[in-house]
Amino acid sequence: MRSHYCGQLNETLVDEEVALCGWVHRRRDHGGVIFLDLRDRDGIAQVVVDPDTPEAFANADRARNEFVLRIRGRIRLRPEGTQNAHMPTGMIEVLAKDVEVLNTAATPPFQLDEHGKVGEEIRLKHRYIDLRRPEMIDKLRLRSRITHSVRAYLEGQGFLDIETPILTRATPEGARDYLVPSRTHAGEFFALPQSPQLFKQLLMVSGFDRYYQIAKCFRDEDLRADRQPEFTQIDLEASFVEESDIMSLTEDMIRRLFQDVLDVELPAFPKMPYSEAMNRYGSDKPDLRIPLELVDVDDLMQGVDFKVFSGPAKADDGRVAALKVTGGATLSRKEIDAYTDFVNIYGAKGLAWIKVNERAKGIQGLQSPIVKFMEDIIESLLDRVGAEDGDIIFFGADKARIVNEALGALRVKLGEDLDLYTQAWAPLWVVDFPMFEADDNGRLAALHHPFTAPSCTPEAFKADPANALSRAYDMVLNGTELGGGSIRIHDQTMQRAVFEVLGIGEEEADEKFGFLLDALKFGAPPHGGLAFGLDRLVMLMSGARTIREVIAFPKTQSAACLMTDAPGEVSAEQLKELNIRLRQKAQNNGDV
């Protein structure tokens, strides 16, 4: 039906006959001549229809925005003075010989060039219209280029693209599972996979050596800006590898991806231990573009007559940290109060601060309600953080976890608000993670997942599991975790030991993970891998604000699809066939 896409037209095609298909982006009538901007996925071309072609003119005259047209005509240069250098096809136009209306269109709920004035709910309800916007087409085209580049790289490295099951069994992997009732096994349920983790390990036991998959994953969890109930991973696993093998391979893959798709050469990927990342940045995924760091001042604060600081400084699980912001003394009290409210979100009880107006005057040159408690240590404090005139110092004092979360988040917010970024891209590897983290009740939970290998011997692990480090590694870019991986446990005894620490007894382990434990008895090779969040990767590379912008048909924050009204009710007959009976829905906010 067509010879070219609209965006392919240029001056080299002048005087050629072309056939175009697309949507009316805009229609204008100037002095009896009709101008149509015809749009397809590649761009927009200007079409001129004059009365000398009566049938074409009549069809163009009745065309409205979003009508679907087929145009045949000749390419010519635009008259001087009407050329548009800001438009890829702005030097030429198509003089139409034939205009065929392939389909009409109702008035859309919003105009494509006015989407910014329309709420996201309306756009998601009519996603098929929203996806016509060039910005959305560009993002999904970029997503396609990314997956193509990744596949080409991994295939070139000897990886096999192998699909793993979508219907599997529920296993405790951290989040809630999406459950699927079985009709043929009454009262029993499949679970949708939170990741292909166990299956890819079994593929290594099977001897496939190198596996990858662009995999759909499902997690029934509370949603945030960077989460969806169904999401996509670039998943890979390899046998007979150590951490350095996987890290080197995936770093090279990401470097080539950025070069191929964005023409960007990423800087070096430094390695940073987890403990250092938490101490210096308050986060295990620090944004190294922001030149702000947390500084420990516990030792200085232990003797001050200010219990808000001295208490946490003396506590085993406490921390007092300072965050110096160069030039931050210009912040108003209103702005500081707003930052105080911000850290409250992360559990901080307040946000102490000191403005350094004129350091040479000693304590008289400082502005703060707390300096009166620090006369004996103030010079040491200012030296410790490297304070100069015009700086502000923020403080966090509480349990170390709260201080890290609050000041870590404040650091990122200050970087955004004050535009402190020093470079466009800042990648790194975070390594040497703890195997476990303790919850509020002191129970241990796997920091990554229970199949991650510890970096110590089985004897050392059993002697002190709480302090064991793991063979895990996370790739971080601009404060976003791009991917996480580890060397896996390939020994059944060690796997049972990890389950035991997590409170998973032998009977429960056999019930839920018996297939994995059995497989580990039959010559499992050392293996490891990594999974990238494709949605996050595309979001970063495209500059999108949320991953909803880089998924064709995303869910809302409440895990619903506004376009299809999913999830929806099913008939009583369907439920009966599945041997399911629903409890009565809550009415008037009452209890179920």
Curated annotation (Swiss-Prot):
According to its UniProt record, this protein's enzyme class is ligase
Instruction: Enumerate the InterPro entries for this protein.
Output: Aa-tRNA-synt_II, aa-tRNA-synth_II, aa-tRNA-synth_II/BPL/LPL, Asp-tRNA-ligase_1, Asp-tRNA-ligase_1_N, Asp/Asn-tRNA-synth_IIb, AspRS_core, GAD-like_sf
One matching Pfam family: tRNA-synt_2
Q: Which PANTHER family match?
A: ASPARTATE--TRNA LIGASE, MITOCHONDRIAL, ASPARTYL/LYSYL-TRNA SYNTHETASE
Identify the NCBIfam families for this entry: aspS_bact (TIGR00459), PRK00476.1 (NF001750)
Family as reported in the entry's similarity comment: Belongs to the class-II aminoacyl-tRNA synthetase family. Type 1 subfamily.
The protein in question is named Aspartate--tRNA(Asp/Asn) ligase
